[in-house]
């Protein structure tokens, strides 16, 4: 396809191996170092891109405190080959933070406010716990139930509303681990994982080029034996059907179509459309439905046009209703999360948006698809979606 000068193209994508937050490979690596390593390596393998041309580093991160505080985008950027004259900002849309980072860069390119951007995100949930420093306003309860801020309970609600059974959730969780393990064994993650040093379970320093979060030994019987994690009386959502708490970072090099043509770069894909949407916080996980419908309408497409979908697996009880109402549940094995998802790989909040987008592009490249959708729910009731076309 021919590019327009202000088209937004993805030049490359990379991510760290996903590490367990409790005693995992990244336990002695800071979030800024993880981010800087990733940015540096991605720029090294794209030597046609001059770091001096980077307009802005836009980095997603949710819990912006401790080592993730004080604008981690700038902290990480200063430790790379990107010069001090390039800017950097940290953004948060909770779970959708690094996809919002991509959207922010895309909007700048579309409006002529820069040509080259580095986007992505990080979350070290082992060093900065999910609730560290969080102090919700009690007055919020006048507008939204307190349970609406408890993501597991919103998944329980959504699953119950849509008649999702415990067995369906367990099957979905099993599928995630099986597909992620298959992708690992077949080398499907090779292009996206940028190796980095970490510590194994015995404390030895080694180079990791694989995700330590995947559990190939997972069985349906094992998942069925787990107790409900959020609603002990009558709940169906378990640790085995929820996204893992993990550490990781993801990164993309994004530029205008004109600059890519000038540099003789063959991009991976072009952004066709973007959208965000809000839903009732009580059904937080339903957000991808309206955001995807909106994005498809903006692109002049329908779901039938889409070859592959990456949906962040916050919870099986959340993902299944979304796929049902997007009319792709019966096509799941052909189109959706073909390399597994967050149940197997984990959901480091600030990292996940760029991670699922990049994984989608690799799935499209490996399977010959043309159009893809990356979408995710966002805590407190939002959805965010990007539609890509492979070049």
UniProtKB/Swiss-Prot annotation:
Q: Output the Gene3D superfamilies linked to this UniProt entry.
A: 3.40.47.10
Keywords in UniProt for this one?
A: Acyltransferase, Cytoplasm, Fatty acid metabolism, Lipid degradation, Lipid metabolism, Transferase
Q: What is its EC number?
A: 2.3.1.16
A GO cellular component annotation here is: cytoplasm
Q: Where is the signal peptide?
A: none
What InterPro entries does the annotation carry?
Answer: FadA (IPR012805), Thiolase (IPR002155), Thiolase-like (IPR016039), Thiolase-like_sf_Thiolase (IPR050215), Thiolase_acyl_enz_int_AS (IPR020615), Thiolase_C (IPR020617), Thiolase_CS (IPR020613), Thiolase_N (IPR020616)
The subcellular localization recorded is: Cytoplasm
- The reply to whether Glycoprotein figures as a keyword in the UniProt entry is no
The record's comment on protein family reads: Belongs to the thiolase-like superfamily. Thiolase family.
Q: What does this protein do?
A: Catalyzes the final step of fatty acid oxidation in which acetyl-CoA is released and the CoA ester of a fatty acid two carbons shorter is formed.
The protein depicted here goes by the name: 3-ketoacyl-CoA thiolase
Source species: Ectopseudomonas oleovorans
Gene encoding this polypeptide? fadA
């Amino acid at each position: 396809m021919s590019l327009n000068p202000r088209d937004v193209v993805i030049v490359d994508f990379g991510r760290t191996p996903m590490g367990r937050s409790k005693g995992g490979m990244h336990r002695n690596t800071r979030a800024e170092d993880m981010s800087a390593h990733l940015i540096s390596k991605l720029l090294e393998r794209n030597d046609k891109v001059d770091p001096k041309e980077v307009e802005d580093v836009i980095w997603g991160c949710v819990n912006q405190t401790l080592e993730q505080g004080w604008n981690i985008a700038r902290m990480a950027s200063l430790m790379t080959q990107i010069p001090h004259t390039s800017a950097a900002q940290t953004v948060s849309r909770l779970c959708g933070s690094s996809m919002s980072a991509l959207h922010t860069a895309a909007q700048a390119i579309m409006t002529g406010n820069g040509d080259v951007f580095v986007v992505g995100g990080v979350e070290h949930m082992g060093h900065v716990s999910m609730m560290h420093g969080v102090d919700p306003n009690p007055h919020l309860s006048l507008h939204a139930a307190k349970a609406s801020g408890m993501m597991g309970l919103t998944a329980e609600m959504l699953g119950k509303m849509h008649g999702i059974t415990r067995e369906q959730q367990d099957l979905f969780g099993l599928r995630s681990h099986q597909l992620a393990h298959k992708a690992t064994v077949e080398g499907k993650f090779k292009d996206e994982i940028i190796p980095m040093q970490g510590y194994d379970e015995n404390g030895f320093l080694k180079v990791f080029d694989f995700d330590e979060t995947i559990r190939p030994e997972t069985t349906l019987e094992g998942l069925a034996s787990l107790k409900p994690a959020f609603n002990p009386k009558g709940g169906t959502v378990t640790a085995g059907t929820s996204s893992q708490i993990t550490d990781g970072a993801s990164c993309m090099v994004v530029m205008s179509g004109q600059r890519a043509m000038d540099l003789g770069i063959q991009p991976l894909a072009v952004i066709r459309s973007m959208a965000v949407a809000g839903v009732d916080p009580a059904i937080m996980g339903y957000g991808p439905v309206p955001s995807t419908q909106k994005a498809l309408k903006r692109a002049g497409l329908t779901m039938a046009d889409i070859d592959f979908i990456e949906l962040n697996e916050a919870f099986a009880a959340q993902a299944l209703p979304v796929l049902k109402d997007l009319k792709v549940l019966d096509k799941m094995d052909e189109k959706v999360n073909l390399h597994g998802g967050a149940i197997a790989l984990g959901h480091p909040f600030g990292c996940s948006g760029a991670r699922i987008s990049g994984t989608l592009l690799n799935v499209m490249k490996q399977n010959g698809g043309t159009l893809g959708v990356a979408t995710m729910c966002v805590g407190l009731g939002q959805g965010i979606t990007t539609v890509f076309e492979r070049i």
